[in-house]
Structure formats: structure tokens, C-alpha cells
């Protein structure tokens, strides 16, 4: 049960497939991409968007959000039952940006959810195509991970803002299924569990009765998902303890926070997938490319090749730097918010800077922002090399890390040493080794103490030239170790607010 996530490949999770071979997986992922692309083309027609407007990432985000909201059954039911003033539960919409007389104008559109569902199903051969919806959720999640630092959320659950490298997927909706669970970081799972336990502490009936049984099985399922992400026996044993607790409370919260901290050095396996905005898939399908026939993978060269040949535009605020906006979106496209910046710079072929040094806010434009001063520019999403995405945490070693983020969660399977600030991390592990989990705690601390600075992760793995589609000649990068490795360094990234 523990390693339920590791039994099937990530593409199989992506497409709900039973064991398929590589060709079948590539075809079913391709089919999913085709569906998103066809839907996007149809929406651009409905909205009468020009080619340029259809390639605007802000329009893409609105269209993606509309279809996700149209299929959000729980929220739709909730809205039906709790009508709020000025909100039609049957409609969905958002800002669409058009170029009128040399200026960008914002237009608020509203559609029947039923109509959007019809267009989506039609684009997906009559299916609900849940995999495609999840794919868009993961793209939004990756964009949030790159744009915002979840300091407040971490502090609220009693964790430390420096643990932000564990927070991948923290904004994914609950309904994102197995593919969503695969990309969630250790910290995200721990945070969900802590929130659950806190509710149980405050609400006598949380674990009781018919609902309580459902709650309990959700709790155990989440514990198992988290257990499956850990790579050492002691960490997994600790998760068994948390899962089997009769009445989860503060002791379990302590254990969870302990295990999250330990994951800064004994990293868990977290999947990484390159999920691109719908406005990349649409034009590719429109140009006659058949993803299902050609096959597609989210963890290989395909997304890199697709981005090499795509034009995507973005609105730019008056004091934003288009190159910085490009970096933000590039990192989101490759699910690389918590990867080592030196490696990212090498793959991208241009310097990748920490979040706090970027002159750019998020990609979305708020409804109260002034459109008169809005410009648009091309996003540079191309890369110099490509590399295979990883779903392992790599093994560990140590290196000077920053005041903000004190560890990384690797995205690419490429040889390097993984930076983490051992003294800072170990300082958090003073004293408390009593209680039921004392032997596991002692064992985990011993392993962390033993993590060696000179150890190399992903030994022998390298990046590849874009012409090397079969990954035959790995190029092992060499790094300037004096450079800063963490993205959320000392940071002044905005907070993510729902």
C-alpha cells in the first residue's frame, strides 16, 4: 500500500491507465493533449480571439479556469445550495483581453457551465477527460509554486517558512486525483494532514459517525500517500505510527512536522511533469500536429521541443521586466520552482535568478488594474538543453544554502550535489526524542547527521542537446558552486492568497 504511487508510471496515473507499455502511454498522454488543444481552439472561436489574442497567456488562464470551474462538481453543488448575491451558480467566466485600436482592453465574459462542459466533451470525443482537467490543474499549481512563497500557510500549520522547498502542489485542489497526489511535496501532504488533525481537535464530531468514517479513511489514505513518498524505512515507520493513531492529536502533529523537517535532508520522491498552458497545445493542434499519433510524454523531451516552436505572449505591467516574466513562466512550465538555480541556468542557457530579484508580479492581472498602461511581449520559453524529469528526491549532501530556502527538491535527473544548509536544519532537531516514535526519531537524526557534503546525486546523469531525442549523449554540467542555489532566497515573493 505504501508505495502505491510507485507501482504505476506517472503517465499511467495521468491517464488512469492500467499497465500500458511505453507506446500506449505516449499515445494516451498525446490524446489528452489533443483534447486540451481542440478545446482551446474552439474557445478561441467562440470568443472571437485573433491568433495573437489566443496566444496570450492571460486569456489561456481564464479559459482553463472556466472549464475547471464548470467541472468542479462539489463547488457547483455548494453554490446551488448556498446562493450568494450576484453570483450565478450556473455560469462561469473571467477576463478576456483583446487588442482594440492599439490598446489592450479587458472584457468580462460569462458562459453557461453546461455550454463549456459541452465544448470540452466535444473536443474530447464525448468523454469527461478528467486527465486533461487534472493536467491543467497541475499547470496552475506549478505556476503558483513559481510565483508565490507559502510563508503564511507554513507558519499557520506550525511549520517553518524555510521549508518552502517541500511545498510543491500546495494549491492543488483536492479533486486532482492520483496524478495530483504524485506531484505533491512532502510539506504539502504534511500540511493537509495537520489541518485535518487540527479540525479533529477543535470539533468533537469530526471523526465520529457516518461522516467520520469517510474522514478517517481519507486520513489514512493521505498518510499512505505521504508514506509512499518517503525513501527511508524509519520515515515510513513514522508514517505508520501517525496513520494508526486512535485519536490523532498534537503528538501526531509533532511527528508530522518532524518528518517534514527530516525531508529537507532525507528527501522524498515527488513527481515532476512539464504541464504547459492550453495556448501552447491549441496552436500546435491547429497546425495539424497529431499528438496521439506522434505520442507525447510529460517527463521527456516533448515539452521542450514543443516550447522551442511555440509563440506565447503575455501582458506586461509598466515596471515589469519581460525577461523576468519569461523566467517565471519557463520555470512553471517545467515544474522547477524548487530546483537548484545553477542547474536551471545551465539547462535554459540564460541566468535564472532568485524570485526576490525578479521585477515581475504574477501572470494574472487583477480586475482593478489599469489596462491603459498595459503592454504585451513575447515570452521566451526556449531552452539550450533538455533533461529528464525525476520523481526521486536524489540522495543528499550539503552545501551553503540561503536564509530563505534551505534545501531543494530536484526536478531534473542530472548529476550534481544537492545544496542544503545542514547546520540550520540540524539545529531544529535538538532534544525531543522521547515518546512513541523515539527510536525512529533517533534513527532519522542519525541518517541526517551522516549525510555527506561530497556525495553526488543522479550520478552519471546529464542534460541532452535538443537534437538528441533518444538521450544518447549525456552532458554532465559543471557548476559554479559560489553561486546561490535557492530560488526563494531571502525572498520578497508575494503571498499566495486564495
From Swiss-Prot:
Name of protein: Nucleoprotein
Ranges where the record places region Disordered: 1-21
Alphabetized UniProt keyword annotations: Capsid protein, Helical capsid protein, Host nucleus, Host-virus interaction, Ribonucleoprotein, RNA-binding, Viral nucleoprotein, Viral penetration into host nucleus, Virion, Virus entry into host cell
Principal localisation: virion
Motif (Bipartite nuclear localization signal): 198-216
Biased composition (Basic and acidic residues): 8-21
The family this protein is said to belong to: Belongs to the influenza viruses nucleoprotein family.
Pfam families on file: Flu_NP (PF00506)
Subunit structure: Homomultimerizes to form the nucleocapsid. May bind host exportin-1/XPO1. Binds to viral genomic RNA. Protein-RNA contacts are mediated by a combination of electrostatic interactions between positively charged residues and the phosphate backbone and planar interactions between aromatic side chains and bases.
Subcellular location: Virion; Host nucleus
Source organism of the structure: Influenza A virus (strain A/Memphis/2/1978 H3N2)
Role noted for this protein: Encapsidates the negative strand viral RNA, protecting it from nucleases. The encapsidated genomic RNA is termed the ribonucleoprotein (RNP) and serves as template for transcription and replication. The RNP needs to be localized in the host nucleus to start an infectious cycle, but is too large to diffuse through the nuclear pore complex. NP comprises at least 2 nuclear localization signals that are responsible for the active RNP import into the nucleus through cellular importin alpha/beta pathway.
Amino acid at each position: 500500500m505504501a508505495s502505491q504511487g510507485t507501482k504505476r508510471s506517472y503517465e499511467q496515473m495521468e491517464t488512469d491507465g492500467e499497465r500500458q507499455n511505453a507506446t500506449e502511454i505516449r499515445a494516451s498522454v498525446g490524446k489528452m493533449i489533443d483534447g486540451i488543444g481542440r478545446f482551446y481552439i474552439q474557445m478561441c472561436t467562440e470568443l472571437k480571439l485573433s491568433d495573437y489574442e489566443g496566444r496570450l497567456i492571460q486569456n489561456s488562464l481564464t479559459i482553463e479556469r472556466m472549464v475547471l470551474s464548470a467541472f468542479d462538481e462539489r463547488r457547483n453543488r455548494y453554490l446551488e445550495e448556498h446562493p450568494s448575491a450576484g453570483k450565478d451558480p450556473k455560469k462561469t467566466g473571467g477576463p478576456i483581453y483583446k487588442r482594440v485600436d492599439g490598446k489592450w482592453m479587458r472584457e468580462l465574459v460569462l458562459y453557461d457551465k453546461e455550454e463549456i462542459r459541452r465544448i470540452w466533451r466535444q473536443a474530447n470525443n464525448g468523454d469527461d477527460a478528467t486527465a486533461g482537467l487534472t493536467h491543467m490543474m497541475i499547470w496552475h499549481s506549478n505556476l503558483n509554486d513559481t510565483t508565490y512563497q507559502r510563508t503564511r500557510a507554513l507558519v499557520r500549520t506550525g511549520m517553518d517558512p524555510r521549508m518552502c522547498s517541500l511545498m510543491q502542489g500546495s494549491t492543488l485542489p483536492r479533486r486532482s486525483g492520483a496524478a495530483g497526489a504524485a506531484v505533491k511535496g512532502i510539506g504539502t501532504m504534511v500540511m493537509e494532514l495537520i489541518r485535518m488533525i487540527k479540525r479533529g481537535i477543535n470539533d468533537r464530531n469530526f471523526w465520529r459517525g457516518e461522516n467520520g468514517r469517510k474522514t478517517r479513511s481519507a486520513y489514512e489514505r493521505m498518510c499512505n500517500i505521504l508514506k509512499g513518498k518517503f525513501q527511508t524505512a524509519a520515515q515510513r515507520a513514522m508514517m505508520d505510527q501517525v496513520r494508526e493513531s486512535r485519536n490523532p492529536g498534537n503528538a501526531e502533529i509533532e511527528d508530522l512536522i518532524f518528518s517534514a523537517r527530516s525531508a529537507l535532508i532525507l528527501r522524498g520522491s515527488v513527481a515532476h511533469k512539464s504541464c504547459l498552458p492550453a495556448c501552447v497545445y491549441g496552436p500546435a493542434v491547429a497546425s495539424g500536429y497529431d499528438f496521439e499519433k506522434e505520442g507525447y510524454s510529460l517527463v521527456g523531451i516533448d515539452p521542450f521541443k514543443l516550447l522551442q516552436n511555440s509563440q506565447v505572449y503575455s501582458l506586461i505591467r509598466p515596471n515589469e521586466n519581460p525577461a523576468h516574466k519569461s523566467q517565471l513562466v519557463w520555470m512553471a512550465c517545467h515544474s522547477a520552482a524548487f530546483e537548484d538555480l545553477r542547474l536551471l541556468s545551465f539547462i535554459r542557457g540564460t541566468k535564472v535568478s532568485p524570485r526576490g530579484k525578479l521585477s515581475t508580479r504574477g501572470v494574472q492581472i487583477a480586475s482593478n488594474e489599469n489596462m491603459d498602461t498595459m503592454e504585451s511581449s513575447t515570452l521566451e520559453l526556449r531552452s539550450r538543453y533538455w533533461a529528464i524529469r525525476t520523481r526521486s528526491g536524489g540522495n543528499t549532501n550539503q552545501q551553503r544554502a540561503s536564509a530563505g530556502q534551505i534545501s531543494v527538491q530536484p526536478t531534473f535527473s542530472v548529476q550534481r550535489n544537492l545544496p542544503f544548509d545542514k547546520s540550520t536544519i540540524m539545529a531544529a532537531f535538538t532534544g525531543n526524542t522521547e515518546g512513541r516514535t523515539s527510536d525512529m526519531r533517533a534513527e532519522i537524526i542519525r541518517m541526517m547527521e551522516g549525510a555527506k557534503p561530497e556525495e553526488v546525486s543522479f550520478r552519471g546523469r546529464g542534460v541532452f542537446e535538443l537534437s538528441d531525442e533518444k538521450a544518447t549523449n549525456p552532458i554532465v554540467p559543471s557548476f559554479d558552486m559560489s553561486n546561490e542555489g535557492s530560488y526563494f532566497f531571502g525572498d520578497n515573493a508575494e503571498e499566495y492568497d486564495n
